[in-house]
């Protein structure tokens, strides 16, 4: 009976003369083993006390958002990373911003900046909500920045929040990895689910004291996705990908229930997922959001050529009231609108991509993965 009860701990830990030595990240396995025999000695309390919303947050959190914020503070104090996996629409952005306002409270010592990596379509929304709900300073890291790789703190050190996109992270990882951030936050963290992708390899190069992943997709649904997310959040929890494949993926696929439960116990303390039906049934099923899209480089070149052509028509006949001239102008405006959607609407030989189309596909994939 004793062996059966503590078998998982024996497999995960190292036996010493006085007991079993385990990594702090194996807290979930310890929690499960002690739950019945020594509930008073649990390393993680099941009921986390609510932390007061910090000064500077200009929003009233719903009860479940208060719990989510308090859960993140609890992990922060223990030195752990986490994955907030609430359904879309439950306010993962606000909960995260509340955590960051808590960390950067005026009475706290000066901390390094936090890097928030987001899909391009969500960049505007994050900046807008950060300005609206917090008193934190912020900047966007983009292609216009000239940052000294040897002294990145000269730029990053002036702000609390640094926003950037996954594309910028991939293309400028040499700069971003030269600075040790307080937090690295990945929104729509499904972007790193492919461990062979450049996005994943770039994300795990980032340096920080703490890491947080935000997703509306249940990461437990795919074991390889689960490993990739946790290799970013808490690299020492699930080991290397090959070891994880051997220790967990293969046995679980063969129907080994004990191993499946063991994996669930290991990861449970670091994942918080609530459904809309569970915590906020009063929220409307349909929400409307305006998403701003940037044109791709090739698309923008076509757009600028058409715009210059239209400008020349206007400059050549500035006072013309000729109906044919007016038609040419209206047709030019229509062509600009079509180019902003996708150049192939008027240029059959165009082989590039479109910012809007890419965003529609990305948003559809997100909605589909979230049910």
Label the model's feature ranges:
Residues 1-43, 110-111, 226:
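Charged, low-complexity intrinsically disordered regions
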Residues 31-257, 264-371:
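ASCE P-loop NTPase motor core, strongest for the SF2 helicase catalytic module
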């Amino acid at each position: 009976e004793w062996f059966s009860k503590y078998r998982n701990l024996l497999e995960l830990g190292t036996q010493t003369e006085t007991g079993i030595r385990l990594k702090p990240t194996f807290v979930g396995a310890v929690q499960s083993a002690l739950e019945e025999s020594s509930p008073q000695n649990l390393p993680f309390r099941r009921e986390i006390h609510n932390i007061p919303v910090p000064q500077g947050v200009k929003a009233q959190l719903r009860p479940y958002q208060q719990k989510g914020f308090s859960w993140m503070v609890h992990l922060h104090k223990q030195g752990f990373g986490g994955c907030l996996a609430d359904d879309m629409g439950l306010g993962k952005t606000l909960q995260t911003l509340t955590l960051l306002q808590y960390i950067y409270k005026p009475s706290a010592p000066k901390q390094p900046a936090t890097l928030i990596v987001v899909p391009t379509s969500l960049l505007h929304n994050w900046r807008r909500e950060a300005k609206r709900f917090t008193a934190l300073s912020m900047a966007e890291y983009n292609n216009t920045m000239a940052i000294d790789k040897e002294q990145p703190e000269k730029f990053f050190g002036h702000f609390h929040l640094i926003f950037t996109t996954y594309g910028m992270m991939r293309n400028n990882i040499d700069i971003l990895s030269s600075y040790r951030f307080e937090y690295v936050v990945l929104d729509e963290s499904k972007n790193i689910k492919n461990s062979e992708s450049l996005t994943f390899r770039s994300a795990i190069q980032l340096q920080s004291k703490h890491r947080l992943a935000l997703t509306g997709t249940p990461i437990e649904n795919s074991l390889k996705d689960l490993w990739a997310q946790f290799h970013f959040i808490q690299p020492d929890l699930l080991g290397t990908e090959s070891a994880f494949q051997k220790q967990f993926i293969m046995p679980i696929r063969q129907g080994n229930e004990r191993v499946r439960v063991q994996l669930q116990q290991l990861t449970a303390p670091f994942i918080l997922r609530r459904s809309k039906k569970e915590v906020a049934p009063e929220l409307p099923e349909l929400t409307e959001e305006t998403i701003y899209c940037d044109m791709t480089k090739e698309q923008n070149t076509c757009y600028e050529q058409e715009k210059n052509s239209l400008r020349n028509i206007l400059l050549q006949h500035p006072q013309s009231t000729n109906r044919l001239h007016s038609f040419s102008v209206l047709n030019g405006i229509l062509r600009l609108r079509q180019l902003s959607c996708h150049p192939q609407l008027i240029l059959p030989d165009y082989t590039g991509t479109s910012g809007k189309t890419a965003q529609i596909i990305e948003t559809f994939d997100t909605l589909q993965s979230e049910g």
